[in-house]
């Protein structure tokens, strides 16, 4: 385990870039050719709607996009990010520093399968996660190791991810995830097996008439049964068109200049 609080490293290393992440000078450090943040981070950060007093964990935080967005949008919030890849954990740490969030954003380098030796049990009111969508052996493996590990279950299966969420959540705490729609049944089954009751679900479509590609799910530890399915979110007005009104409102609420910075 490595808990980063300060570093003497230069802000940028070879093969990295410092890019805009929303408004008012928010920046993110990321690999030029490796893993880079996507719209998924924006969607789950907005969906989670944290409360000011929430203790927040970004499980598998990558380069820190979700944690940075939350820290920027909700100034009192304190966020812990857990990431297994050392290079990405370092990027998240340095991203916190370059944005002045080092007092509110802690990055822990470690394996979520060993979360019991890294973080306290039931220590968080809200856990966010954007887990790898593909099982090993399904689909073409990305040749880049950072992207491969982010997209395929190379380091942890869905079952292991959900078990780590269950460990970290306080009683009645919330878990918010974004996942591929084709694996919705797997996700809901695993959540219930860990006594994380699905409470909210929102399908995400590219445009009207397209199948859902992603799903946003909120589950509550030891919550009562009862799932509310929210209206679908359409990212674009039409195939090849501009952002939908709903998506534009999400951008304006969370990070108004992300479209110009290239995330969309």
Q: What are the roles of these predicted feature ranges?
A:
Residues 155-205, 212:
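Conserved Class I SAM-dependent methyltransferase catalytic core
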Residues 131-160, 164:
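Mobile active-site "lid"/loop adjacent to the S-adenosyl-L-methionine
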Residues 44, 130, 161, 219:
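Residue-level signal for inorganic ion chemistry
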Residues 29-50:
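Conserved SAM-binding loop and adjacent beta-strand
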Residues 211-264:
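SAM/dcSAM-binding transferase cores
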Residues 47-140:
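Conserved SAM/SAH cofactor-binding pocket of Class I
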Residues 1-17, 30:
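N-terminal auxiliary segments of SAM/dcSAM-dependent transferases
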Residues 30, 109-110, 179, 202:
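Short loop/edge segments at beta-strand edges and connector loops
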């Amino acid at each position: 385990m490595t808990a980063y609080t300060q570093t003497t490293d230069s802000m940028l290393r070879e093969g990295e870039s410092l890019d805009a992440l929303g408004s008012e000078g928010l920046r993110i450090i990321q690999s030029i050719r490796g893993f880079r943040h996507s719209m998924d981070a924006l969607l789950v950060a907005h969906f989670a709607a944290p409360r000011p007093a929430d203790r927040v964990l970004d499980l598998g935080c990558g380069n820190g996009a979700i944690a940075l967005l939350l820290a920027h949008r909700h100034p009192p919030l304190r966020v812990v990010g857990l990431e297994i890849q050392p290079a990405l954990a370092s990027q998240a740490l340095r991203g916190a520093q370059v944005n002045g969030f080092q007092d509110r954003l802690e990055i822990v380098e470690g394996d979520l399968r060993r979360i019991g030796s890294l973080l306290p049990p039931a220590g968080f009111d809200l856990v966010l996660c954007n887990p790898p969508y593909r099982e090993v052996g399904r689909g073409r493996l990305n040749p880049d190791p950072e992207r491969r590990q982010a997209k395929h279950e190379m380091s942890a299966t869905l079952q292991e991810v959900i078990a780590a969420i269950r460990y970290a959540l306080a009683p009645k705490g919330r878990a918010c995830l974004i996942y591929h729609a084709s694996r919705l049944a797997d996700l809901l089954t695993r959540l219930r097996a860990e006594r994380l009751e699905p409470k909210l679900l929102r399908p995400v479509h590219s445009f009207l008439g397209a199948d859902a590609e992603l799903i946003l799910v909120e589950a509550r530890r030891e919550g009562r049964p009862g799932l509310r399915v929210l209206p679908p979110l359409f990212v674009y007005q039409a195939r090849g068109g501009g952002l939908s009104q709903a998506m534009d409102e999400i951008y304006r609420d969370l990070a108004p200049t992300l479209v110009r910075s290239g995330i969309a």
